[in-house]
Amino acid sequence: MSKFVKKIKIIKPDDWHVHLRDNEILNQVIKYTGKFYKRAVIMPNLNSPITSCLKSIAYRNRILKSMHLNYKFKPLMTCYLTNSTSPKELEFGFSKKIFVAAKFYPNGCTTNSKTGIKKISDITPVLECMEKIGMPLLIHGEEINQNIDIYDREAKFIEKTLDPLRKKFPKLKIVLEHITTKESVEYIKNNDVNYLSATITPHHLMLNRNDMFYGGIQPYLYCLPILKKNKHRMALRKAISNGDKHFFLGSDTAPHLHKNKINMLGCAGIFNAPSSLLSYVKVFEEMRALKYLQSFCSENGPKFYNMPINKETITIIKKPCKIIKKINVGRNVIIPFLSGEILNWSIESD
């Protein structure tokens, strides 16, 4: 595509990694996903994690009830894996389309992961079942150990956990979520696209770790996996700018109340739903790779999940768009990524 492109029409995207939370927060943030995306993979790490079919059905119903009339989308539910997860429960949930995937959180790796897995060998029967039925395993890929530097956790996870897992279960479909490093890019590209792919967030494409400390600590840029060196950011940008089918859109939009982002133990997570798609467009434009925008946003994900590609389209135009400054949640607020900033692209209907 020409660098002078003023309008882009693509198949309506899906977001393959979304945190909607619950209750008041759910009610206030949900429309921002529905505005831009046709489907969304919903993360299960609520305060009471989604560990069963019944919990998933109930949570999906709450999501549907909260959905904005003008911004509807299809929530794709996931199961939070614990040491108590039953292979039969997973198989039933997957066969009935209650779950589209299961999520592996290493214990203590991020928000509400205290009941996550300490040793992946503890869930071998679950993984055997998932490989057999073709159920994708979604992974937060960080090795959690106080002796491992936080900036090295992702690379260590590949070495210590992911590579042995791939060798033991070569036909297990795996998504390494929100990758942040050159090592992850190289590892993913060297594996079969049918069995290993990765999502990439807009903030890891736009920022490096210096940004988190520019002018003082920036709590709203604190996320997990943490922002990395610029060489890693550039590796991510290069990965998406050549049309590689291994990589697809997963925003990891993660809302937290303002008071919980700025306190003594601030929460990790960036709420980017109001700007995520437009941020991806910005990055692809900067990389002169707009011709690959549709495959990353709208095609690679459904192909990996063996789902139909959407028929609906969305038109993005070269028109300034100011990102909402804050979202009120009762007496609290949520501050989104790029709060109050202006992006050069808008949805045509805006």
From Swiss-Prot:
Residues reported to bind Zn(2+) 1: 17, 19, 103, 252
GO biological process assignments: 'de novo' pyrimidine nucleobase biosynthetic process; 'de novo' UMP biosynthetic process
Binding site for Zn(2+) 2: 103, 140, 178
EC number: 3.5.2.3
Cofactor(s) this protein cannot do without: Zn(2+)
Annotated pathway: Pyrimidine metabolism; UMP biosynthesis via de novo pathway; (S)-dihydroorotate from bicarbonate: step 3/3
Taxonomic classification: Bacteria, Pseudomonadati, Pseudomonadota, Gammaproteobacteria, Enterobacterales
Keywords: Hydrolase, Metal-binding, Pyrimidine biosynthesis, Zinc
Name this protein carries in UniProt: Dihydroorotase
Annotated substrate binding sites: 19-21, 45, 140, 224, 256, 268
GO MF terms held by the record: dihydroorotase activity; zinc ion binding
